[in-house]
Amino acid sequence: MTATASQELYEEIEGAYAYFNEVLFDGQLPGCLFTLQRKSNTFGYYSESRFLRRNGEGKSDEIALNPAYFAHRRVEQTLSTLAHEQVHQWQAHFGKRSRSGYHNAEWANKMQSIGLMPSDTGEPGGKRHGQQMTHYIIEGGPFDLSSKELIEQGRMLSWIDVVTKRVPMSAVLLYGPGGEPVPGTPEDPTIDISALTSAGLLQPDPGKEDPKNKRKYTCPSCHLNLWGKPGLSGRIQCIECAVPFMDS
């Protein structure tokens, strides 16, 4: 029987979790229940003991991933979010947590040990601990190497949300051990964003205007209006007033 989309995606996430648990956490993590959540302005989150078996025999932590960002992040970046949340789980079971939502030095040290550099900006030079934290991938670090090996083994995150969001945070680049940026493609080359957009399966980038859409331009002096293609503001001039037309 062919696996359903749900089975396929969850098996891939479960497999990635188990793989990172072995190679980055020495098999210490107890497992969890995975969910897909479109929570605003977050790539994912961890919640301890969030689920309880209905008969009371057993409970499970939750790790959530936000599918709205799958299409606009490379696979290893989404996997780095999974590993980030696994560090939270490791600390919940084996470390000492600080107040709710605060990322302390112990968490930061564990992140760095698996090859993810904590940073409040997502870039070198950011604070290593604090309330609002993200990270960047260290080139050649344990996570960088293990995620590449995992992706080479086969399909990973093969289903993407067709209603996508642009990445709102900085954790999208790869940096070397000294903090120098490593060149990389801005989007996963296995995902054809243009094709999906043309097919109506993705929302077009709001930052790019369709050249076929006409814009209204106004002379700021005599208030004469005209319509033309996008990008003409300041480039065309009112003959009567000798001033450029502007967006209106």
Where are these regions (language model features)?
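Short, conserved micro-motifs enriched in small and acidic residues
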Residues: 73-77, 81
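Active-site recognition of the HExxH zinc-binding catalytic motif
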Residues: 80-93
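Metalloprotease/metallohydrolase-associated module, dominated by Zn2+-dependent proteases
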Residues: 2-72, 96-248
